[in-house]
Amino acid sequence: MIIRTPEPTGENGPAGQRPRSTLAGVRPDDHTVACRGLCRVCGREHVLYDNGARRYGLELMDLLRSRRSLDLRGAAPDHQPRLSTPWLYREARGKMFGVMECLAPDGSRRILRAFSGQYNGLWEIDGWAPPLFDSRKLTAISAATEAEIKELGMELAAAGGDPERSRILRRCRRRLSQDLMRQIHGLYRLTNFHGREASLFAACGCGSAIPTGTGDCCAPKLLNIAARSNLVPLGMAEFFWGRSNRSGSREEGRFYPSCAEKCAMILGFMLCGLEARHADIVG
């Protein structure tokens, strides 16, 4: 998920010297806002701008187009069929991808990459930012409950014309689904740039009413792995790739800001502390 880029030269200074920050004093009309959110801990809104990260997004588009796979290490595109990009043009449709330029402790630049949600049933793919939870634990807690839900569905189908029995079964199935979602949300661990960790519930500040998919978008994945890897994000960009979504609100090759419907409520916490890290860069 981390790619080293050449040491900065020219206007950023020779290799080995701390680069000039492009972030100090940035105003909203200077750069496109990549992601933003209100931190419920400090009470402030935090923002990360594009800051030129779109060029890395365009490079990733070229790779996806030429490789036809999320395996970008040089293997043949048919080496891992589940990673093939033609999947994005079928019934599942396309998805968002993200890139983030970061500064490493040694002064080098790193590029992180992420895809939203799962890719063809996979949460983790080499070279891409991982989810905010342990996917093995997710599989473990999901298996048993999903089996119960499936069994209730079969009982519901067999209930036939018994309305009272059907009502009870539907209520039980709904309760099981809600309990499973709470357990899944309980697996998420968010880290910010103060080095503080929080659960999804604490970061959202909204109890158990958390929209499905919160924390699975590109921005949370990228911010989380950057914070945990002691990297300082300099800029981020997200784009859509594949067949347009059913509503037509996403088109291939176009850049979009981070998800406001699901992830804005946690991005404030995740971005908290980044301004101080940027100030350290400026010196």
Where on the chain are the PLM-derived regions?
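Catalytic cores of nucleic-acid editing and processing enzymes
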Residues: 1-283
